[in-house]
């Protein structure tokens, strides 16, 4: 049950991160701005809850399974960077390279967690 819920949250975070990357690029190109209270704040709050639940589940996964390629520090970094990614995808106040680095880092670890869940569930 733990791994199924964690898998669903991981897939949801991957989708949010990929949509955020697209939104950032579109916003940078079109100079589109979003209303803080109507759009940005609800999105960040919703994803803050998702990231907190995901981090809790991922840390439990690490404690129970002790995976070789996923560590506590990565999980904590993903939680913080994921929220930064969501926020910056709306406001575009971050350099393109920095945003790209954050996005790639978040997606790398999310995919590593997803692979770890799949590896353990297939045994």
Curated annotation (Swiss-Prot):
Which InterPro entries does UniProt cross-reference here?
YppE-like, YppE-like_sf
> Per its UniProt record, what Pfam families does this chain match?
DUF1798
Q: Which residues form the signal peptide?
A: none
Q: What is this protein called?
A: Uncharacterized protein YppE
């Amino acid at each position: 049950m733990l791994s199924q819920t964690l898998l669903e949250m991981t897939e949801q975070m991957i989708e949010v991160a990929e949509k955020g990357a697209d939104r950032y690029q579109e916003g940078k190109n079109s100079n589109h701005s979003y209303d803080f209270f109507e759009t940005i704040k609800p999105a960040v709050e919703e994803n803050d809850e998702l990231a907190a639940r995901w981090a809790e589940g991922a840390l439990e996964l690490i404690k129970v399974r002790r995976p070789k390629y996923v560590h506590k520090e990565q999980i904590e970094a993903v939680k913080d960077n994921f929220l930064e990614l969501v926020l910056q995808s709306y406001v575009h106040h971050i350099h393109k390279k920095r945003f790209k680095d954050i996005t790639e880092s978040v997606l790398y670890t999310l995919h590593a967690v997803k692979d770890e869940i799949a590896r353990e569930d297939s045994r």
